[in-house]
Each structure stands twice: as structure tokens, then as C-alpha cells.
């Protein structure tokens, strides 16, 4: 599966790339903010996007994800340090949003990928 990572922390990017490679996926692009993510997604057409809820720049990860889904219909997994209950209420994530908490663990990422692909 071709995956776009939208993340502003180098250590998280490194962890994700390593885990995704072990799981047999290919990271086809990296972006550190929402505007770049939207541009890259349009150019590379990833199968899945992993996006941090808190991004640098004018656009949050949630705002960027809304654009990405409406423009390209690409499944999204949100990366966060918060719990899902906290996020659903404070950031108005949909109830069916798939989130993964940092630190990223291989088994959890594998589970999240399978969940998002079911929808």
C-alpha cells in the first residue's frame, strides 16, 4: 500500500517509516504541513494518509484531513498524543475516525490500517 505521512516530528516519521516497511507498505511521500499534504496527495494519489492532528502552519491536521477526504476520498489515520475521547469532543472528529496514539507501536498501527480499510 502507498502511504503519505503528514508529520512534523522527525522521530515519529522515522518510527512510522520503519514500521510501515516491516508491514510491507511503501511511504511514497512526506509532508510537514497541511498545504503541502494536499498538494502531494493530489500528485501521488496515496492509498492511505497518516496525519498528525497538530501540524505546523496555518492548517491543523484535522482541517487538512477534511480537505483531503473531500478532494481525494483517501482514508485517514490521525496520529496524536491524546486519547480518542478527548479528541472526539474537543476537535470534533467523527465518531468513526481512526486514531493512533504516540508512541507508535507496530501491532497498533497494523490494527488501525485494517480498521480504516474496512470503512
PLM region descriptions:
Residues 9-29:
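Two-component/phosphorelay signaling modules centered on CheY-like receiver
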Residues 30-48:
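Acidic, metal-coordinating helix/loop segments flanking the phosphotransfer/catalytic sites
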Residues 33, 59-63:
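Acidic catalytic/metal-coordinating carboxylates
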Residues 52-53:
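Active-site residues of response regulator receiver
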Residues 62-73:
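Short amphipathic alpha-helix used as the core "switch/output" element in two-component signaling
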Residues 79-80:
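Hydrophobic/aromatic residues positioned on beta-strands within the core alpha/beta folds
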Residues 86, 104-117:
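C-terminal output helix
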Residues 91-100:
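As written
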Amino acid at each position: 500500500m502507498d502511504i503519505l505521512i503528514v508529520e512534523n516530528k522527525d522521530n515519529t516519521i522515522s518510527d512510522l517509516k520503519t514500521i510501515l516497511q516491516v508491514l510491507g507498505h511503501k511511504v511514497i511521500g512526506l509532508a510537514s504541513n497541511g498545504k503541502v499534504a494536499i498538494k502531494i496527495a493530489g500528485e501521488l494519489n496515496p492509498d492511505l494518509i497518516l496525519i498528525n492532528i497538530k501540524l505546523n502552519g496555518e492548517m491543523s491536521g484535522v482541517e487538512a484531513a477534511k480537505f483531503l477526504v473531500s478532494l481525494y476520498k483517501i482514508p485517514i489515520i490521525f496520529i496524536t498524543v491524546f486519547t480518542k475521547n478527548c479528541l472526539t469532543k474537543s476537535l470534533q472528529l467523527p465518531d468513526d475516525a481512526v486514531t493512533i496514539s504516540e508512541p507508535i507501536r507496530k501491532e497498533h498501527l497494523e490494527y488501525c490500517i485494517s480498521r480504516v480499510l474496512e470503512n
